[in-house]
C-alpha cells in the first residue's frame, strides 16, 4: 500500500486516448459552444468526461477518474474570487471587493457550481468510475488568489496576527467544503483526486503552498506548517505538492509533520523532470523521513535507474506515457522490482491486501520457475488493465501457496 510506504504505483498525471480501445460505447458530446460551456456547464462537462474516461487507457494503475477541476485553488473562487475560462485551464482572479474578511457564503454561485458539477458527473458515472475532488488548495495560496501575492507577502510583516487568523479561517472553511464535496463523490469511503490519477481508501487531499518559495523558513513554520499539520490530522491520506527548487528549504518542516503520508515533487521551470538523477538524493531523504514519494513525468529510460537508486517501496510513478506499448514496457520493468522487493515476501502479504480491488499495488513474492508459469495470468491481467481477473488469479495463487 503506497500510502503506508510500501510497493510501487505505476501511473500518469491524467490520461491518453490515442490507440486505446474504448471501454464503453460512449459518444462524444457536441463541441462546446464557447469557453463558458466548456468549463462551467455541469451537464456538458459530465457528458464530455463520461466520453473521456471511456476512451482513456486504464492499464497498470491508471485510474478511471473524471477530472472535475475548476481551476487551481478553486476554494478561492468559492470565497469570492472571479473565474475566467481559458483554452486549457481556468484562471481565478482576485476578488475586487475583498476587504480582508474571510466569509463563506453557502449561496455563492461558485460554490453552487462546484456541487452541481460533481453531482452531474456522479450521476453520469453511475458507479463505473470515480469523480475526482476539485483542486481546492488551502492557506496562503488561497489568500493570494483572493487578494494578490504581493499583499499576502506584505501581510507576513505588516499584520502577521491577522494573517494567522485568516489561515485558521480558511482551514475551517476548507474542512466544511471538503466534507460536503467528499459526500458527493465518495464510493463507499474511497475517493479520488482530480489529478495524478490518485486514489485512497478514505478521505485524501493534495496539500501545497506554492507561495512558500517567497517566504522564510520561520514564516513557513508560522503561517503554513501548523495549518498543513491540522489538515493532515483531520484527513486520512495526505500528499504534499512540493513545487520548485525554491521551496526545497521547507522540506525539513514538512518532514516534521508526522501525519503527512507522502510528498510529490515538481522540479519547476528550467529543471529536469522528476526522473532525473538530480533528484535521487531528494527522494532518498523524503523516504528516509518516513514519507512516500511521487515522482512526476518519469520517462521509460529513467525508470529502471530511478528504482535502482531509490528502491521500490513507497514510490508512486507519474510516467510520461504516450501509448499503451510504453505502459506495457514500464509494467515489465516494475515487475522485476515487485518480485525482488523485501516488502513482497509471503509473510508481509496478507490475504486481504492481495485481494484489494482498487488502486493498491499487487506485490508477488519472488517465484521459482514453476511459480513463474502460474503467475503469468496475473501479470497479463494487470497489463491488460483487467482488474477482476487480476484479483481472481491473486487469490488463487495465495490459496495454492505460490
Regions found by a protein language model. Name each.
Residues 41, 159-160, 386:
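Short, solvent-exposed helix-helix connector turns and helix-capping sites enriched
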Residues 34-45, 98-115, 306, 398:
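Basic, amphipathic N-terminal segments that precede the first structured/catalytic domain
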Residues 85-89, 131-148, 353, 358-359, ...:
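Acidic, low-complexity proline/glycine-rich segments
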Residues 1-30, 52, 59-67, 104-348:
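Active-site loop segments of alpha/beta catalytic cores
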Residues 68-105:
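Well-ordered mid-protein domain cores that form the structural environment of catalytic cofactors
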Residues 350-402:
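Long amphipathic alpha-helical segments
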Residues 32, 149-150, 160, 372-376, ...:
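Residue-level signal for cytosolic alpha-helical hairpin/rod architecture
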Residues 32-80:
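Membrane helical hairpin/interfacial module
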Amino acid at each position: 500500500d503506497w500510502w503506508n510506504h510500501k510497493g510501487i504505483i505505476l501511473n500518469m498525471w491524467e490520461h491518453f486516448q490515442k490507440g486505446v480501445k474504448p471501454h464503453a460505447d460512449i459518444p462524444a458530446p457536441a463541441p462546446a459552444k464557447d469557453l463558458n460551456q466548456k468549463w462551467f456547464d455541469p451537464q456538458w462537462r459530465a457528458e464530455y468526461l463520461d466520453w473521456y474516461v471511456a476512451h482513456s487507457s486504464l492499464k497498470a494503475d491508471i485510474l478511471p477518474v473524471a477530472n472535475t477541476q475548476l481551476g487551481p485553488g478553486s476554494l478561492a473562487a468559492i470565497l469570492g474570487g472571479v473565474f475566467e475560462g481559458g483554452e486549457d485551464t481556468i484562471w481565478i482572479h482576485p476578488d475586487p471587493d475583498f476587504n480582508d474578511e474571510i466569509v463563506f457564503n453557502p449561496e455563492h454561485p461558485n460554490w453552487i457550481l462546484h456541487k452541481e458539477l460533481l453531482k452531474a458527473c456522479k450521476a453520469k458515472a453511475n458507479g463505473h468510475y470515480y469523480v475526482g475532488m476539485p483542486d481546492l488548495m488551502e492557506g496562503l495560496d488561497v489568500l493570494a488568489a483572493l487578494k494578490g501575492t504581493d499583499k499576502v507577502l506584505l501581510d507576513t510583516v505588516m499584520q502577521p496576527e491577522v494573517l494567522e487568523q485568516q489561515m485558521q479561517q480558511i482551514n475551517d472553511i476548507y474542512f466544511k467544503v471538503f466534507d460536503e464535496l467528499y459526500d458527493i463523490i465518495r464510493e463507499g469511503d474511497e475517493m479520488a483526486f482530480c489529478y495524478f490519477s490518485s486514489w485512497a481508501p478514505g478521505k485524501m487531499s493534495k496539500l501545497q503552498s506554492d507561495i512558500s518559495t517567497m517566504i522564510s523558513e520561520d514564516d513557513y513554520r508560522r503561517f503554513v506548517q501548523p495549518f498543513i499539520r491540522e489538515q493532515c490530522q483531520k484527513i486520512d491520506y495526505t500528499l504534499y505538492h512540493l513545487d520548485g527548487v525554491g521551496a526545497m528549504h521547507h522540506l525539513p518542516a514538512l518532514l516534521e509533520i508526522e501525519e503527512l503520508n507522502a510528498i510529490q515533487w515538481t522540479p519547476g521551470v528550467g529543471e529536469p523532470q522528476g526522473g532525473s538523477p538530480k533528484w535521487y538524493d531528494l527522494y532518498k531523504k523524503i523516504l528516509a523521513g518516513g514519507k512516500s514519494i511521487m515522482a512526476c513525468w518519469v520517462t521509460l529510460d529513467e525508470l529502471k535507474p530511478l528504482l535502482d537508486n531509490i528502491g521500490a517501496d513507497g514510490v508512486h510513478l507519474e510516467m510520461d506515457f504516450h501509448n499503451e506499448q510504453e505502459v506495457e514496457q514500464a509494467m515489465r520493468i516494475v515487475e522485476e522490482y515487485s518480485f525482488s522487493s523485501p516488502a513482497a515476501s509471503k509473510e508481509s502479504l496478507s490475504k486481504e491486501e492481495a485481494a484489494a480491488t482498487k488502486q493498491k499495488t499487487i506485490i508477488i513474492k519472488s517465484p521459482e520457475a514453476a511459480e513463474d508459469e502460474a503467475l503469468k495470468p496475473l501479470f497479463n491481467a494487470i497489463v491488460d488493465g483487467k482488474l477482476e481477473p487480476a484479483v481472481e488469479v491473486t487469490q488463487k495463487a495465495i490459496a495454492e501457496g505460490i
